[in-house]
Structure formats: C-alpha cells, structure tokens
Amino acid sequence: MKTILALSLLAAPAFADCPAGTDYSSQIATVVERMQAAPHEGAARVLSAQMWDIWLDAPDELAQAMLDAGTASIQMGDRMVATSHLEELVAYCPDYAEGYNQRAFASFLQGKYDDALVDLDAAIALQPVHLGALTGKALTLIELGRAADAQ
C-alpha cells in the first residue's frame, strides 16, 4: 500500500494540469519602464530584483516545489539533478517561462550551450522582456562563438 501511495505521488505531475498562473505583464511593463528611467545602477538593481520576484513565482505549489528543487540543486552544484527537476517543471508547465530559463541555466553550467539556447528562445518567446533569458542568450551565443549574434 505504501508503495502504491509513493508511486501515485511521483506520478502526480504526469496527470495534473498546470494552471495558467498569474498574468504579471502589466507589473513587468511597469518595472521595465521604471528601470529605463532609473537614475543610477543601484535603483536599477532594486527593480531587477522585483522582476526576479515576479518570474520566480510559479503557477502553483507543485510547480513552485519543482522550481525550488531545481534552483537549489543548481546552487549546490548538482546540475544534473537540477536539470531533472526543471525538465519535470517544463513538462508540467510548458507556458511558464522561468522553467525554461532555469533549465537553460543548468544546461549552460554543464557546457550544453545548444540545449541552453533552445530553452532561452522558448523563455523569450513566452516572456519577451525576460532580462535573465535575454542576458543568458547573449552569454550563450558568446560561448558558441557567435558574439556578433549576441548584440
């Protein structure tokens, strides 16, 4: 019985649907506008942190747990485990840009630049002003020897 319960919990993401999540587009647009008018770098950094708070807010608790596990694994240097968690997140929430961005980061750290680029393009398609994904794409293109494309 315990085995069945454990297997059902592991399979939950395969049977669940990720909710649409909160539409933060107006808040992001406001933060971008304020960043462009920031009087100095310090003010822009505060606003950048606000954007990260928005992007790191997953659509539901399950997605948040997957994201948190992935980012914690990245921080601990276990990039393969991070990739596994983030693959689950992307499969569960294919419309959540930060899942792709974090998986791209894990790929980048493993030197898998082509994989990172695919995920960064997906994140940018979902969230065109995702500064983390845009910056990550530029850095990835540089690593691929495509510095001219990074500009």
Stretches found by the model and what they are:
Residues 88-89, 122-123:
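Canonical positions in the second alpha-helix
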